[in-house]
């Protein structure tokens, strides 16, 4: 994997910097590195593809070295270099696609394709190593079963979940109380509602709770907490739990009271915030617990009082909500990230070449299914294919 990254980094630099008119002295070190790559690769043969519709291709390396010059690089020099660069880039692209198409239930973090396994051989250690990539660094650690640490922005840590729980219900569905939520990606939105606006609750206060367990622990997370859940702020028709009927939800938004958010790790509270909105920090957690209240307003203007009558029918439904959004966090496991294209790149390659469903990844690389059942085998394979995708993205956009 390190060799693949070093090859890609060298090729990217060569493609960007070996251009007509450049002083040789400005790129002499790069050209020496490029020549070392050629010397190491010459005489070797590789094969890629042969899975799904990814065609089998054979690769032979027999290239001349780039020479020295006292002046600027001329058109012939650059054209000669370009021919070599383009062949190498095509090779790297196919090695990456071959690797992204494969998976293994055992030791899935290790190279799976024939070509990448061959590049891991001792003879290729002479290629200049550049391990500055976060993914390469963490792949090395994971490969040695040591602690990794990926920094994600907008991590897709929450499997998609949209549902409701009714704490008070009746066949007519005309006086309901409960919670509804939408968890997806890096965001939780939860709303507590009471058709009667807590008129019969103790002290006219309804208490709500929403607990979300993460599939992997996060550390040093920057989080935004808002006293609103905009996705539940407009009328809607909702299917009943048994699917036998539908019920009408017509929210009127109130501000939540006594809001508390707890971040827990292995059942122990690590951080707690009360009535604090905006940016908050969570040190280490695998569970989020949200507590909030709906309080019937003690004083109401006639217009507000008309919204919340003392008895049925209740045409407007008192609702309070919260939004919790993870802006950035560190995770020991690799995750999809809304700010990265790695999952999209891997999925696109597997779809384009009709890669058959294997023993590890779900059909279509369904992220909700993948993260819901995030096994060690999936984690290993995902770290490998994301590392390869990050390498490929240097050369192929």
From Swiss-Prot:
Role noted for this protein: Intermediate capsid protein that self assembles to form an icosahedral capsid with a T=13 symmetry, which consists of 230 trimers of VP6, with channels at each of its five-fold vertices. This capsid constitutes the middle concentric layer of the viral mature particle. The innermost VP2 capsid and the intermediate VP6 capsid remain intact following cell entry to protect the dsRNA from degradation and to prevent unfavorable antiviral responses in the host cell during all the replication cycle of the virus.
Gene Ontology CC terms: viral envelope; viral intermediate capsid
Residues that bind Zn(2+): 153
Localization annotation: Virion
GO molecular function: host cell surface receptor binding; metal ion binding; structural molecule activity
Other remarks in the entry: The VP6 trimer contains a zinc ion located at the center of the molecule. The zinc ion is not essential for either trimerization or transcription activity of the DLP. Zinc-depleted VP6 has an increased sensitivity to proteases.
Region annotation (Interaction with the inner capsid protein VP2) ranges: 62-73
Gene3D superfamilies: 2.60.120.170, Viral capsid alpha domain
Coiled-coil zones: none
Domain of life: Viruses
UniProt organism field: Rotavirus A (strain RVA/Human/United States/D/1974/G1P1A[8])
Sites where the protein binds Ca(2+): 266, 286
Membership in a protein family: Belongs to the rotavirus VP6 family.
Protein name: Intermediate capsid protein VP6
Main location: virion
PTM note: The N-terminus is blocked. Sumoylated with SUMO1 and SUMO2. Sumoylation of viral proteins seems to have a positive role on viral replication.
Keywords carried by this UniProt record: Calcium, Capsid protein, Intermediate capsid protein, Metal-binding, Ubl conjugation, Virion, Zinc
Biological process per Gene Ontology, one example term: fusion of virus membrane with host plasma membrane
Quaternary structure and interacting proteins, as annotated: Homotrimer. Interacts with the inner capsid protein VP2. Interacts with the outer capsid glycoprotein VP7. Interacts with the outer capsid protein VP5*.
């Amino acid at each position: 994997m390190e060799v693949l990254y070093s090859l890609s980094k060298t090729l990217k630099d060569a493609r960007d910097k070996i251009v007509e008119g450049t002083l040789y002295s400005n790129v002499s070190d790069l050209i020496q590195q490029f020549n070392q790559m050629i010397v190491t690769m010459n005489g070797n043969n590789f094969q890629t593809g042969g899975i799904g519709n990814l065609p089998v291709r054979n690769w032979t390396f027999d290239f001349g070295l780039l020479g020295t010059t006292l002046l600027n690089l001329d058109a012939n020099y650059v054209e000669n270099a370009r021919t070599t660069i383009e062949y190498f880039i095509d090779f790297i692209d196919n090695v990456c696609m071959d690797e992204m198409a494969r998976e293994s239930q055992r030791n899935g973090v290790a190279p799976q394709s024939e070509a990448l396994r061959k590049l891991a051989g001792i003879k290729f250690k002479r290629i200049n190593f550049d391990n500055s990539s976060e993914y390469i660094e963490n792949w090395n650690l994971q490969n040695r079963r040591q602690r990794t640490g990926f920094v994600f922005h907008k991590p897709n840590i929450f499997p998609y979940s949209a549902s409701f729980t009714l704490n008070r219900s009746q066949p007519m569905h005309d006086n309901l109380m409960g919670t509804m939520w939408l968890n997806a990606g890096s965001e939780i939105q939860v709303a507590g509602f009471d058709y009667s606006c807590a008129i019969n609750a103790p002290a006219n206060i309804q208490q709500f709770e929403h607990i979300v367990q993460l599939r992997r622990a996060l550390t040093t997370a920057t989080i935004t907490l808002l006293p609103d859940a905009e996705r539940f702020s407009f009328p809607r028709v909702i299917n009943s739990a048994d699917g036998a009927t539908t019920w009408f939800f017509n929210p009127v938004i109130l501000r939540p009271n006594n809001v508390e958010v707890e971040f827990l790790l292995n059942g122990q509270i690590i951080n707690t915030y009360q009535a604090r909105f905006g940016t908050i920090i969570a040190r280490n957690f695998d569970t989020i617990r949200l507590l909030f209240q709906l309080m019937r307003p003690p004083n109401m203007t006639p217009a507000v009082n008309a919204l919340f009558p003392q008895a049925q029918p209740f045409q407007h439904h008192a609702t309070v909500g919260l939004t919790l959004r993870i802006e950035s966090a560190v995770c020991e496991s690799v995750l999809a990230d809304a700010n990265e294209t790695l999952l999209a790149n891997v999925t696109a390659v597997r779809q384009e070449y009709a890669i058959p469903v294997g023993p590890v990844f779900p059909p279509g690389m369904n992220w909700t299914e993948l993260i819901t059942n995030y096994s060690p085998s999936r984690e290993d394979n995902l770290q490998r294919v994301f590392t390869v995708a990050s390498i490929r993205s240097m050369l192929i956009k």
